[in-house]
Amino acid sequence: MYLTLQEWNARQRRPRSLETVRRWVRECRIFPPPVKDGREYLFHESAVKVDLNRPVTGSLLKRIRNGKKAKS
């Protein structure tokens, strides 16, 4: 089931201004990403805001940053 931007925002613990939610959509901070249908966004009812401030860690990222020595 899909919800409009206003409906999705109203279901959040702390509803934000509509412009803030639109900015989150443009910055890909909502997962799964909303679908643009004409003039409005449609959100999946299970969509959540993703926090981009958390550090990204992973073995591949470490290998890219440190070279082959990080693999072993």
Curated annotation (Swiss-Prot):
InterPro entries: DNA-bd_dom_put_sf, Excisionase-like, Excisionase-like_sf
GO molecular function: DNA binding
Domain of life, per lineage: Viruses
BP-aspect Gene Ontology terms: DNA recombination; provirus excision
Gene3D superfamilies, per the entry: 1.10.1660.20
Keywords assigned: DNA recombination, DNA-binding, Viral genome excision
Signal peptide residues on this chain, from the entry's feature table: none
Protein task: Excisionase and integrase are necessary for the excision of prophage from the host genome by site-specific recombination at the att site.
Protein name, UniProt field: Excisionase
